[in-house]
C-alpha cells in the first residue's frame, strides 16, 4: 500500500464549515516581551511535545480566540497537511498540501517567503509531510526523493548543497539501483552536531528500496554514515534473512522519524515492517531490523542495541512513531529511558544506554501460518506493563450495539472472518486485525510530562480485515497493482475510482512511472508500453495480458485483497464504542491513569449518540501548568484542551478542516500562541489548507 485513506462507504460529512474562523484583534502583551520557540519537530529533541509556557492556563484556556489564519491556497481534493510547525525567533516554518515550504510572521500569520520545489508545476497526487528542520539559518525539507537546503531568511536554495541543483537525491547510496522506486521522507530528520540524520518512506510492496537510516553533512549535503536496516553480508542480523535478501528486500524503514539524545550522542529510531506486508515467503526469518527499536552512535552510525518488537511481521505492525526520551522513577531511582508506542496499543519502556527492559516482557506462542510457503514466527514478545491502551481482540461481545441492524451486519462479518487469536496469520478466508493497520498508536506520537511521568497517547480503536487471494498474473493490473489497489479498479483502498477525473492521462502516466508516497515507480521495471496499458486501465477499465510470474523477480504467490475497515451496513465502525481514545499512562507505575473517548461523529451527535470516539491522527502537546491540547479527530474538526490530571475537557474550537497534525505552541512579544495545521482529507473527509493560531484576547 502507499496511502492509508480508505475509500469505503462512510457517513456523509458536511462539506461546509460549521464555524468560519474570525481573526481577533490581538493587542500588545504587557507582561513580557520575551520569545519562546518551538524549535524542532514535536517541540524538542526528546520528542516529548512538552512546554513550560504558562500564559495559557486551565483557568483561562476557555477564553482562547483565533489570533490569525493563514490559507496556503494549496488544498485539493484528497489532500492532507500533517505538518507540525517549527517556530524560531518569531518566524513560523511549515509546509503546504502541495509541499511548498514557507515562512510566516508567527505573530500575524503574514507570509514572509515560500519555496515551491516543483517550480509551480505540482501535478499531485497527495504526499504527506509532517514537518521541516531549521538549523543555523537553513531550512531542510524533503520533496519526494529530493532533500533540499534553503536559506531560512530568503527561501532560496543554498547553492552547491548536495548536487549543483541544491538538493540531495535520497535514492543514491542505498547499495543497489533504486532510481525507479519511491524513496522519500515523510517525517523530518534531526540535527546532531553537523549532521542531519533522517529515515525514509519506501513502498510496502516489492519492488521496494531498503530502509537505511542516514546522516548527511548539514553544510555540504555529503553522506557521512549509513546504517543498513536490512543487514549486508557480515553485518549483525544478516542471518535473520534469506541469503542475498539485502539485494532485493525492502522496507524495515524508520518512516516515523528519529530521536537524538544530544548529550549521549545516541540516535534512536523505530522501524516498519519488511515488504511485502502480509506475505513473507520471500523473506523467511526474523527479519532484523524490521519492527525494531534501534539505538546507534550518532557520530558514526554504529550499532549500540536493539529490541525487535515483532518477528517476521505479517500484519503491517510498523512501529508508528519515533521513540520518546523520558526519565522515570524505577525502584526508587531516576532512570533515563526510551518510551515506544505501538500499533497494537503497547508501550515499551527501555533503559536508554543499554536497551534493558524496565518492565518485564513475556514470550507467547503464536499460531502457525496457513498460506503455502509462509513460515510465521513461533513466538512473539510483549511487554507486561503498562497494560495495553487499546483492546486486543474482537469477540461477539465487543461488537456494536448502535442499532440491531448494525449489530447484525457486524456479527455477519465477524463470523465470516474467524480470528481465534490476536495474531492469527493472514489467510484466504479473512482475518480480523485489531487494533487495525492504523493502530492503536499512530504517527502523531505521545506527549510526555517529565514532572508526573505521565505519557499521553491518543489511540484508534478500529478493526480491519486482511484477506489474501492468489495473485493473478493474467493481467497487468492483477500482477502489478492489485497488491495495494484491490482486484478491480473499484477497490476498498487506496481508491482509483474517479482518478481520471482528478488527473490527466499524462499525470497518471507520470505517477506510474515515478511513483508517489509509498508507491514505487515502474519506469525501469515495466517500460513505457506497459505503463501506458496501466494508464488506459485506470481510465477505461480495460486490462491487457502479462506474463509477470515468469518475468518479475518480485512476483508473490499471494496478495492482499484490499484494506477493509470493519464497518457496519451504514459505514460506522462495527465494534462497540469507544472508536477512539485519549489515554494517560503512568510510566513510573506501569498503569493507566485515565482514559476517555476521543472524538465524535457530528451526524451521530445529532441523533443523540455522543462521546463515541473516532479515528484520530496527530499528537498532543502537554504544558507544565496542567493542559493537554490536541486536535487530531477526523470527523468533528475540533481542537480541544483537557485537564492533564483527569482528562476533563476545558475548551474546544471548531476548525475549518480536521487538524490531523500535532499543534505547536510558542511565545512572541510576550504572547503565547497555539497553532494547528487544518489539512483534513483523512478517510474521505474534506481537505483543507489553512493554519489557525489561537491566543488569549
Cite the ranges covered by each PLM segment:
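Periplasmic c-type cytochrome electron-transfer domains
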Residues: 44, 390, 397-411, 415, ...
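Extracytoplasmic electron-transfer domains, predominantly the class I c-type cytochrome c fold
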Residues: 138, 184, 266, 475-478, ...
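Bacterial N-terminal signal peptides that target proteins for export
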Residues: 3-18
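Extracytoplasmic/lumenal domain signature
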Residues: 59-73, 101-122, 147-180, 212-248, ...
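Repeat-blade elements of multi-bladed beta-propeller folds
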Residues: 38-42, 78-100, 124-147, 181-207, ...
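Mature N-terminal segment immediately following signal peptide/propeptide cleavage
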Residues: 32-77, 85-87, 583
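Glycine-rich (often Gly-Gly/Gly-Pro-rich) flexible segments and glycine-rich loop motifs
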Residues: 360-417, 573-580
Amino acid at each position: 500500500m502507499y496511502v492509508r485513506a480508505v475509500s469505503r462507504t462512510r457517513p456523509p460529512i458536511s462539506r461546509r464549515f460549521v464555524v468560519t474562523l474570525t481573526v481577533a484583534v490581538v493587542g500588545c502583551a504587557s507582561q513580557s516581551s520575551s520569545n519562546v520557540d518551538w524549535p524542532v519537530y514535536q517541540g524538542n529533541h526528546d520528542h516529548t511535545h512538552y512546554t513550560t509556557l504558562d500564559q495559557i492556563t486551565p483557568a483561562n484556556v476557555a477564553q482562547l480566540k483565533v489570533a490569525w489564519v493563514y490559507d496556503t491556497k494549496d488544498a485539493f481534493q484528497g489532500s492532507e497537511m500533517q505538518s507540525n510547525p517549527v517556530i524560531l525567533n518569531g518566524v513560523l516554518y511549515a509546509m503546504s498540501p502541495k509541499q511548498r515550504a514557507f515562512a510566516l510572521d508567527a505573530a500575524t500569520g503574514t507570509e514572509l517567503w515560500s519555496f515551491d520545489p516543483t517550480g509551480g508545476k505540482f501535478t499531485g497526487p497527495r504526499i504527506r509531510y509532517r514537518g521541516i528542520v531549521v538549523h543555523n539559518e537553513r531550512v531542510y525539507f524533503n520533496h519526494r526523493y529530493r532533500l533540499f537546503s534553503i536559506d531560512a531568511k530568503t527561501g532560496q536554495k543554498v547553492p552547491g548543497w548536495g548536487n549543483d541543483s541544491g538538493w540531495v537525491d535520497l535514492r543514491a547510496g542505498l547499495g543497489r539501483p533504486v532510481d525507479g522506486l519511491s524513496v522519500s521522507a515523510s517525517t523530518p530528520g534531526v540535527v546532531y552536531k553537523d549532521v542531519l540524520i533522517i529515515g525514509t518512506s519506501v513502498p510496502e510492496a516489492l519492488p521496494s528500496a531498503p530502509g537505511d537510516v542516514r546522516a548527511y553533512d548539514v553544510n555540504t549535503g555529503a553522506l557521512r554514515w549509513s546504517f543498513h536496516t536490512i543487514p549486508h553480508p557480515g553485518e549483525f542480523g544478516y542471518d535473520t534473512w534469506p541469503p542475498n535478501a539485502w539485494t532485493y528486500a525492502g522496507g524495515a524503514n524508520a518512516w516515523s522519524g528519529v530521536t537524538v539524545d544530544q548529550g549521549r550522542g545516541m540516535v534512536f529510531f523505530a522501524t516498519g515492517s519488511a515488504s511485502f506486508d502480509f506475505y513473507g515467503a520471500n523473506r523467511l526469518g526474523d527479519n532484523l531490523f524490521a519492527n525494531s527499536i534501534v539505538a546507534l552512535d550518532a557520530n558514526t552510525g554504529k550499532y549500540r542495541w536493539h529490541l525487535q518488537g515483532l518477528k517476521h511481521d505479517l500484519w503491517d505492525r510498523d512501529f508508528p512513531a519515533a521513540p520518546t526520551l523520558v526519565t522515570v522513577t524505577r525502584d526508587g531511582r531516576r532512570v533515563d529511558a526510551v518510551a515506544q508506542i505501538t500499533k497494537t496499543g503497547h508501550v515499551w519502556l527501555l533503559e536508554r544506554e543499554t536497551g534493558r527492559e524496565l518492565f518485564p516482557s513475556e514470550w507467547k506462542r503464536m499460531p502457525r501460518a496457513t498460506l503455502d510457503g509462509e513460515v510465521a514466527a513461533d513466538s512473539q514478545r510483549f511487554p507486561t506493563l503498562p497494560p495495553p491502551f487499546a483492546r486486543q481482540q474482537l469477540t461477539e461481545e465487543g461488537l456494536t450495539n448502535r442499532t440491531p441492524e448494525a449489530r447484525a451486519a457486524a456479527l455477519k462479518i465477524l463470523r465470516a472472518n474467524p480470528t481465534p487469536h490476536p495474531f492469527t496469520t493472514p489467510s484466504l478466508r479473512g482475518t480480523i486485525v485489531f487494533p487495525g493497520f492504523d493502530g492503536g498508536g499512530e504517527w502523531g506520537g505521545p506527549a510526555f510530562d517529565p514532572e508526573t511521568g505521565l505519557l499521553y497517547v491518543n489511540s484508534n480503536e478500529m478493526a480491519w480485515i486482511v484477506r489474501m487471494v492468489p495473485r493473478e498474473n493474467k493481467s497487468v493490473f492483477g500482477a502489478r497493482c492489485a497488491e495495494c489497489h484491490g482486484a478491480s479498479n473499484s477497490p476498498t483502498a487506496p481508491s482509483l475510482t474517479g482518478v481520471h477525473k482528478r488527473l490527466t492521462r499524462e499525470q497518471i502516466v507520470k505517477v506510474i512511472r515515478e511513483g508517489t508516497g509509498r508507491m514505487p515507480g515502474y519506469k525501469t521495471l515495466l517500460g513505457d508500453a506497459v505503463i501506458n496499458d496501466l494508464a488506459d486501465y485506470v481510465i477505461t477499465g480495460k486490462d491487457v495480458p502479462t506474463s509477470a510470474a515468469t518475468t518479475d523477480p518480485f512476483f508473490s504467490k499471494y496478495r492482499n485483497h484490499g484494506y477493509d475497515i470493519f464497518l457496519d451496513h451504514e459505514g460506522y465502525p462495527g465494534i462497540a464504542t469507544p472508536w477512539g481514545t485519549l489515554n494517560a499512562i503512568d510510566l513510573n507505575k506501569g498503569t493507566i491513569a485515565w482514559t476517555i473517548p476521543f472524538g465524535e461523529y457530528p451526524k451521530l451527535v445529532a441523533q443523540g449518540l455522543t462521546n463515541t470516539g473516532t479515528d484520530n491522527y496527530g499528537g498532543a502537546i502537554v504544558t507544565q501548568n496542567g493542559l493537554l491540547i490536541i486536535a487530531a479527530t477526523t470527523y468533528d474538526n475540533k481542537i480541544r484542551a483537557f485537564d492533564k490530571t483527569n482528562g476533563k475537557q476545558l475548551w474546544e474550537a471548531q476548525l475549518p478542516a480536521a487538524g490531523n497534525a500535532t499543534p505547536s505552541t510558542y511565545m512572541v512579544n510576550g504572547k503565547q500562541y497555539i497553532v494547528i495545521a487544518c489539512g483534513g482529507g483523512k478517510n474521505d473527509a474534506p481537505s483543507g489548507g489553512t493554519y489557525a493560531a489561537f491566543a488569549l484576547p
